[in-house]
């Protein structure tokens, strides 16, 4: 199995980061198989969504509505509302699997692979790409 870790600097901002180009580069020339995208973090997830039409902010706003950033959480270290970040992986999985055909991601027309990072306390993130040949 081919595998690679990609390091991302997210700074002190929360948000959605498009990693589709990095994923496409990783599988280029690999033939048919499956790409697993994994975020080894307790407060980040991987999603396949449309980007560039406001969906990124819609996702963050929806997560903020579902998981308010206040002091209701028992997990209280870090910035205010950080406990919400630790609930995120139950809603946005830390991994996604994308089919690959002839070395290309078989995503839909508007689909992109993104890192969902609501946690501004961690300025650096890792994403692991793993390719399993078919």
How would you describe each model-predicted region?
Residues 1-134:
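Active-site histidine-anchored catalytic micro-motif
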């Amino acid at each position: 199995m081919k595998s690679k870790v990609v390091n991302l600097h997210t700074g002190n901002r929360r948000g959605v980061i498009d990693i589709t180009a990095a994923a496409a580069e990783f599988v280029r020339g690999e033939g048919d198989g499956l790409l697993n995208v994994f975020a080894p973090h307790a407060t980040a997830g991987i999603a396949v969504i449309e980007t560039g039409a406001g969906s990124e902010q819609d996702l963050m706003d929806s997560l903020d509505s579902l998981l308010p950033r206040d002091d209701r959480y028992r997990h209280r270290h870090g910035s205010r509302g950080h406990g919400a970040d630790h609930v995120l992986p139950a809603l946005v999985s830390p991994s996604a699997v994308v089919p690959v055909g002839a070395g290309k991601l078989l995503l839909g027309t508007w689909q992109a692979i993104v890192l969902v990072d609501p946690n501004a306390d961690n300025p650096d993130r890792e994403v692991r790409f793993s390719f399993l040949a078919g």
